[in-house]
């Protein structure tokens, strides 16, 4: 007979898992959690207990009612006795307190009369201060002479005057000499969102959907698993099979919703993955059964453990002939994830994202873990949550993907998001439909902000737009002041370091990406590169096309510009050529890291180099059946050839990269079209061409090894 798990038995007899665990403890049967298995003897004992309980319930309904009434009377009498006793006690205490107060009052008046004598002041129970404290203030708080405090400071090697400010550590040291504890009181500024927070009452809390993060190594099948769950295709078209942006999606199973955060799997996305773990309730760790534990798998485990989030291991690709789930279990045991089959507490679900096997069991486990976790939020309050992703859209302006964590977000709500503010103009859910409200654990994309926030920023809804504007502007102003002071410090520190160390090899980089999350992740990854004698210094990061100002900054700082999924505009290109600034353009994150790392080690030895040979401005489009979309364009630069690669750029962002299918001049097929002439172009297997797009023609040229 197959062994039954605690939760399965509970489900079968319609009792909660917690009740079963409690009953087992009374029987002296030790179980760790709801996933523990039950022996046949234990099941029989439980059956006997619950059958007896049901029989008693039906037989003793009337006596129970009578008992209840009599017990209520007894309880009422007991309550009255307790209240009378309490009243008498309170009377006594009040009289004692009055006498004490009188005595205290007499002492107080005696102290006031004896003030000229200046008796020794008693040490306080504790000292409270904000930010810092002067020597004079500390002496007054301790009831000591200023000279005595200055003497103590001199013994510690600190030369100070009466009005000199002391930091927290020094205040603590001096206070500890007198045995007085110190507490720093943090006063929330107008710019702190916590100041406008409202505490939720327990009775207002309601069950909310779980937020699940899918983590794991690159190419282990995270996005395919999510795709299998959602039953829609989101993998196709992603460069190198790596998810480039964090997406948030919601599914519904048996009337219960689950929100998924899809964090990219490559080690470069450390910051994005860490940010995902901050808002998540459960982590699904995807490990390929044919590949085992990899560096990014270990990294994902550490993030989930640091966030104290329960981990469910999804052993993927079990349909492959080389799959070995036992090896995965063995390797994960070394990292503290022991399967419940081996006496541990970690849930392991073998599955195949490709065939769909094991998906239902995984969803059941997610709902079970969330049920045990008792996830709750108050939906009837001003919304609060976190930014998952943000970008600047030419048509819609600032667009931010938000995850509502508590409260309900409405269209028209005044909102502060990080250092930006605005009013929620429109809300779109994960399937692209416009919605008017979004409750707890719901991901939505909003427009209406005055600027692009940073991924990971907190947001809060305010009562009126005026307050939201004031707080948003104050936060932006504060950030600007901090940046200015940091920059001033940095330049001075760098100058000192160079004088002190002599020659320091620095690689200055400017990072531009299509979305904030990619820029953040790329910056973090590049700063992690460690090569002896060489330092990486990110002097600027931004979102959007590479502009002329980026090139001027690079020229002044002797920096290399890295574009991820973005292109330089016309002015930037010409300025880069004039100023001799190196621009590196990439679509795959790890290629950027490999290239920079190789350059730092002095091992970069490219064999081929991309050369842009021409540019076409799309002025009109024609849709023809069996052919697709034909772009009518004007060659603004260089030459377009039929055998060259073609890149479609929209608003400075690369939309597609492929090959020229047909190149025509009037009705004739031609091999090339030069600058100043019109032409017709079709792109192989791609039809989404629009007026105003730019096509860039390029070839790969072999260059000499140096």
Curated annotation (Swiss-Prot):
Per UniProt, the keywords (alphabetical) are: Cytoplasm, GTP-binding, Initiation factor, Nucleotide-binding, Protein biosynthesis
Q: Where is the composition biased (Basic and acidic residues)?
A: 55-81
GO CC annotation terms, alphabetical = cytosol
Kindly list the GO molecular function terms attached to this UniProt entry: GTP binding; GTPase activity; translation initiation factor activity
- Region G2, as annotated, extends over 241-245
Bias-annotated ranges (Low complexity): 82-98
Query: Region (G5) spans which residues?
Result: 352-354
Q: Where is this region: G1?
A: 216-223
- Chief location category: cytoplasm
Domain named tr-type G: which ranges? 207-376
Name where it's found. Cytoplasm
Return the annotated region ranges for Disordered.
Answer: 55-127
Q: Where is this region: G4?
A: 316-319
Q: Do you know which Gene3D superfamilies this protein is assigned to?
A: 1.10.10.2480, P-loop containing nucleotide triphosphate hydrolases, Translation factors, Translation initiation factor IF- 2, domain 3
- Pfam family for this entry, one: GTP_EFTU
What is its biological role? One of the essential components for the initiation of protein synthesis. Protects formylmethionyl-tRNA from spontaneous hydrolysis and promotes its binding to the 30S ribosomal subunits. Also involved in the hydrolysis of GTP during the formation of the 70S ribosomal complex.
Q: Which family does it belong to?
A: Belongs to the TRAFAC class translation factor GTPase superfamily. Classic translation factor GTPase family. IF-2 subfamily.
NCBIfam families referenced in this protein's UniProt entry, alphabetically: IF-2, small_GTP
**Protein name stated in the entry:** Translation initiation factor IF-2
């Amino acid at each position: 007979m197959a062994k039954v798990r605690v939760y399965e038995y509970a489900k079968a007899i319609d009792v909660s898992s917690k009740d079963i665990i409690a009953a087992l403890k009374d029987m002296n049967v030790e179980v760790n959690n709801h996933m523990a298995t039950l022996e046949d003897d234990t099941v029989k004992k439980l059956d006997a207990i619950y059958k007896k309980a049901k029989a008693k319930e039906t037989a003793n309904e009337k006596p129970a009612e009578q008992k209840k009434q009599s017990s209520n009377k007894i309880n009422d009498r007991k309550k009255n006795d307790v209240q009378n006793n309490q009243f008498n006690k309170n009377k006594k205490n009040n009289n004692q307190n009055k006498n004490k107060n009188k005595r205290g009052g007499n002492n107080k008046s005696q102290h006031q009369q004896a003030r000229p004598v200046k008796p020794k002041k008693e040490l306080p129970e504790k000292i409270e201060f904000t930010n810092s404290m002067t020597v004079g203030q500390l002496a007054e708080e301790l009831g000591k002479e200023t000279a005595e405090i200055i003497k103590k400071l001199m013994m510690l090697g600190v030369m100070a005057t009466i009005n000199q400010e002391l930091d927290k550590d020094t205040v603590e040291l001096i206070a500890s000499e007198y045995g007085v504890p110190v507490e720093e009181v943090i006063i929330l500024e107008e710019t702190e969102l916590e100041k406008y927070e409202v505490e939720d009452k327990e009775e207002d809390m309601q069950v909310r959907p779980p937020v699940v993060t899918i983590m794991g190594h690159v190419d282990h099948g995270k996005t395919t698993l999510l795709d299998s769950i959602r039953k829609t295709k989101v993998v196709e078209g992603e460069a190198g099979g790596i998810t480039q942006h964090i997406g948030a999606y919601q599914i519904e199973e048996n009337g219960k919703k689950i929100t998924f955060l899809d964090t990219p799997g490559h080690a470069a996305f450390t910051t994005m993955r860490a940010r995902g773990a901050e808002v998540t309730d459960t982590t699904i760790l995807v490990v390929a059964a044919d590949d085992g534990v990899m560096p990014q798998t270990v990294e994902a485990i550490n993030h989930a453990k640091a966030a104290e989030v329960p981990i469910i291991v999804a052993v993927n690709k079990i349909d492959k002939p080389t799959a070995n789930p036992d090896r995965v279990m063995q390797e994960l045991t070394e990292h503290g994830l022991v399967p419940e089959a081996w006496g541990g507490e970690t849930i392991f679900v073998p599955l195949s994202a490709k065939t769909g096997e094991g998906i239902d069991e995984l969803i059941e486990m997610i709902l079970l873990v969330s049920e045990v976790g008792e996830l709750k939020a108050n939906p009837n309050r001003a919304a609060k949550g976190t930014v998952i992703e943000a970008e600047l859209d030419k048509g819609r302006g600032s667009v931010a993907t938000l995850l509502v964590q508590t409260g309900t977000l409405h269209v028209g709500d005044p909102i502060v998001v990080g250092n930006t503010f605005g009013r929620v103009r429109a809300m779109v859910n994960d399937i692209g439909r416009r919605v008017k409200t979004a409750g707890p654990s719901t991901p939505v994309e909003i427009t209406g902000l005055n600027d692009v926030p940073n991924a990971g920023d907190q947001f809060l809804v305010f009562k009126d737009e005026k307050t939201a504007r004031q707080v948003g502007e104050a936060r932006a102003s504060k950030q600007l002041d901090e940046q200015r002071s940091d920059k001033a410090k940095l330049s001075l520190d760098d100058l000192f370091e160079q004088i002190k160390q002599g020659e320091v090899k620095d690689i200055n980089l400017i990072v531009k990406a299509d979305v904030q999350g990619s820029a953040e992740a790329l910056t973090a990854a590049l700063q992690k590169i460690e090569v002896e004698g060489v330092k990486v210094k990110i002097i600027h990061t931004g979102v959007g096309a590479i502009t002329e100002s980026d090139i001027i900054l690079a020229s002044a700082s002797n920096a290399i510009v890295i574009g991820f999924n973005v292109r330089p505009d016309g002015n930037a290109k010409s300025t880069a050529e004039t100023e001799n600034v190196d621009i590196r353009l990439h679509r795959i994150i790890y290629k950027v890291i490999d290239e920079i790392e190789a350059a730092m080690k002095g091992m970069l030895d490219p064999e081929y180099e991309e050369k842009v040979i021409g540019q076409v401005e799309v002025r009109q489009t024609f849709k023809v059946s069996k052919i697709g979309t034909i772009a009518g364009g004007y060659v603004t630069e260089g030459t377009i050839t039929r055998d060259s690669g073609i890149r479609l750029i929209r608003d400075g962002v690369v939309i597609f990269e492929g090959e020229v299918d047909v190149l025509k001049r009037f009705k004739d097929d031609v091999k090339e079209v030069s600058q100043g002439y019109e032409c017709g172009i079709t792109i192989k297997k791609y039809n989404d061409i629009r007026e105003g797009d730019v096509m860039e023609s390029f070839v790969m040229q072999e260059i000499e090894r140096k």
